[in-house]
Amino acid sequence: MNRKDFVVLPWGKPGNSVKLKYRNAQELRMEKVQLEFENQEMEKKLQEFRSTRNKEKEDRESSEYYWKSGKVGKLVNQSYMMSQNKGNVVKFSAGKVKLKLLKEQIQEPVKPTVNYKMANSSECEKPKINGKVCGQCENKAALLVCLECGEDYCSGCFAKVHQKGALKLHRTTLLQAKSQILFNVLDVAHQFIKDVNPDEPKEENNSTKETSKIQHKPKSVLLQRSSSEVEITTMKRAQRTKPRKSLLCEGSFDEEASAQSFQEVLSQWRTGNHDDNKKQNLHAAVKDSLEECEVQTNLKIWREPLNIELKEDILSYMEKLWLKKHRRTPQEQLFKMLPDTFPHPHETTGDAQCSQNENDEDSDGEETKVQHTALLLPVETLNIERPEPSLKIVELDDTYEEEFEEAENIVPYKVKLADADSQRSCAFHDCQKNSFPYENGIHQHHVFDKGKRDFLNLCLRNSSTYYKDNSKAETSNTDFDNIVDPDVYSSDIEKIEESTSFERNLKEKNIGLESNQKSDDSCVSLESKDTLLGRDLEKAPIEEKLSQDIKESLELSNLYKRPSFEESKTTKSSLLLQEIACRSKPITKQYQGLERFFIFDTNERLNLLPSHRLECNNSSTRITLAGQKSQRPSTANFPLSNSVKESSSCLSSSHPRSRSAAAQSSSRAASEISEIEYIDITDQNELSLDDTTDQHTLDNLEKELQVLRSLADTSEKLYSLTSEEFPDFSSQSLNISQISTDFLKTSHVRGPCGVEELSCSGRDTKIQSLLSLSESSTDEEEEDFLNKQHVITLPWSKST
C-alpha cells in the first residue's frame, strides 16, 4: 500500500486515534483527467486572446490615423484625413519606431472664489442644531439628561455608550420637561414684578425686558453660553440700572441669600401680604432672575417644596380626612368635635360641604340605629304543636342475626303454605347477588290488611324433627340450591295464624285422603339456558322408602299463590292462610356428570326408582329465579334415569284427577321436551329410527293429550278454588293441544324480578302404581320408551 493513497486527519485532543481515509484510485484518475481538460481549455482561451490582441495591434499600425509633425487636421473626420494622407505616405524603415502623440491644451474654466470659500466653510463648519448638542457625539441634539451624572445625551449615545458597565443603572429624564419647569417659575416672578412696580423708569423696564428675552430663548442656547457671557450681560444691565445695584455688577453674588429671598417673596405673595417692602421684593426678584440664569449654566435643577392647592369650590384635604375619620360617629359628638376655624379661602364652602356631609351622616346613623334596634329585638318563640309520629322504629334483638351467621351466600330451603282442601308446594331459587340480604329477606315485617295493619314476622327456623325426616327421605342428597325470594313475602298474604292443632288436623285429613290422591307424573321445570335441573341417583330399596315419602309429601305442601298485588286483592276477604316455613341446610355431593346416563339395566332401573318417586311425592310448583349466579348447582347437568322416563309415560293414563290436571299434563309434556332436548345434545347418534314406530308414538301422544283435555274440564267442578286464583293454570288448560311448542316459548318468558314461572303440581299416587313399574318393566319396554322419546324430538326439532 502506498502512503499517498491515505489522508491523515489528526485530532486536536491528545489520546485520540488517528483516522486514515483511503482514497479510491478511480476517483484520483478522474480528478487528474478533469484537471488536464481544464488546463487545455485555459490554454486555448489564452491563445485566442493573444491572436485578437495582435490583430488589433496590426490594424492600428496599418492605419494612417496617426499624428504627424507639421500637419494639422480634424480629429473627428477620419475619412478626410485618410483622403489627404494617401498621397503623402511616408515609408518607414524596418525596426522600432517611436511615436509621440500631441494633444491640444484646453483651458479649464476658472471657478469663482466665492463658491470655493463656501465649499470650504461648509466642510469645516458643523451643522446647526436647534437646542442642546449631545455631549458624546456632538452631532445630534440632546434629548435625555442623566439624573446621576447631569449630562445631556442623545438617545443613541446614551443607550450605546453611557448606559454600559457600571453605569447601566443610571436613569434619565426628558430635557424639555425640565426646561419648561424652570421657565414657568421665572415667568411667574417677572409677571409679579410688573404688577408690583408699574411706575418704574424706562431703563428698569428695559432691563427687565432684556432679562425676559434671555429667559424666553430656548434652553439649549442659554446652556451653551458660558459664565463669561452671563457676566457681560449682567455688566451691561448694571450700567443701565441705578447705582444701588453695583454690588451685582462687581461680581459678588450670594446664592443662599437669593434663594431665601425668593422663598420669602413666594410665601408673601401666596398669603396676600405683598404690599410691604416693595423695594426689597424687587431686589429679590432681580436676584432671583440672575440666580436662575446662573443655575442653568451650572446644570442645577430647580426644586421647590410640594404644595397641594385645592380650588375654592371643593373641600380641603384635611377636611376630607376629618370626614373620613368621623363619618360613623353620632350626631351629638360631631357638633362637639367641630373645629372653630378653618382656612380663610375655604371657610364658606367648607361649612356648606360640612352641612351636606352631616346630613348624609345623619341618614347613615339612622340606618345603623334602626339596624341595631332590629337586631336587639327579642325573638318571639313560636310554639308549634307537632303531632305524634305515625311511624315508629322498633329495634329487633340480635338473636335473628345470630341464627344465620353460619349461612353462606347460597342456602337452600323451602317455604310450605298448607290448606285443608288442596296441597301445593313452592320452591324458590335465588341468585347469589340478590339485591336483598339474606337476613333482611327472612326477618322483615310486612303490613297487610289496611284496616288492621297486622305485622307478619316471617322467621324461618330449623325444626329438628323435620330435618330428620327430610334427611331420611331425601337420601339421594338432592341439592336444589334454592333461596327464598323476599318478593314472595309481599302484599299477597293478608293474614297468617299459627296453630299446632290446625297442623295436626291437616295431617290426619291428608292421611285419610291418602287412597284418593293421585301422584303427579313429573316434577320437572323448564330451566334457563345456563342451568339444567337434574336429580341425584340413589341406590336404596323401594320398600323402605315408600311410607316415608308419602308422609313427607303430605306434611310438606303449600298453597300456590302467584306473587302479584292484583291477585292479593281478589283473595283478601276469602282466604285464611297459614305458613309453615322450614329451612333445610345444603347437602352437597360430588359432581358425577354423565356417569350413569348410558346404563339401562333392569337392576339399575329398579335401584334408580326411589329418586323419581321422591320427586313425584315432593312435586311442587317451582319458581326458578334466574339471576347472576357465579356457580352452578351440583345437580345441574344430571340426566334423568330410564325409570323416571318410563314412569312418566306409564302414569300418563292414570285415574281421573283434580282441577289441576291440565297443568299436570302440560308439565309432563314440558318435562319430556326438556329431557329430549338434553338427550338430543348428548346422544345424537341414536336418532336413526323407523318411520312406522315414530308415527305410532305420535298418535299415542295425541290421544293422551285429548284425554287430558277432557279431564281438565271435569276437574274444575270438583276443585274448590276459583280460576281467578290460578290464571296460569286456566290459560294453560286451554292450550294443551299446542303444549309441545307453547311450553318452550313460555320457558323463556320471565316475569318481574327475573322469575321463570314453571308449572308442576299434583298429589301423591297409589303405591300399587309405583310397584307395578318395577315389576312390569322389561328390556322391550325400555327400547319402546327410548323410541318414543326420540320420536318426540322430531316434530319439536322441525318446529324450531
Swiss-Prot record:
A zinc finger (B box-type) spans 129-175. Residues 641-668 have a biased composition (Low complexity). InterPro entries: ZBBX. Residues 197-213 have a biased composition (Basic and acidic residues). Residues 197-220, 341-366, 626-668 are annotated as: Disordered. Residues 626-640 have a biased composition (Polar residues). It comes from the Eukaryota. Keywords: Coiled coil, Metal-binding, Zinc, Zinc-finger. GO terms for molecular function: zinc ion binding. Residues 21-64, 693-720 form a coiled coil. This is Zinc finger B-box domain-containing protein 1. It comes from Homo sapiens (Human).
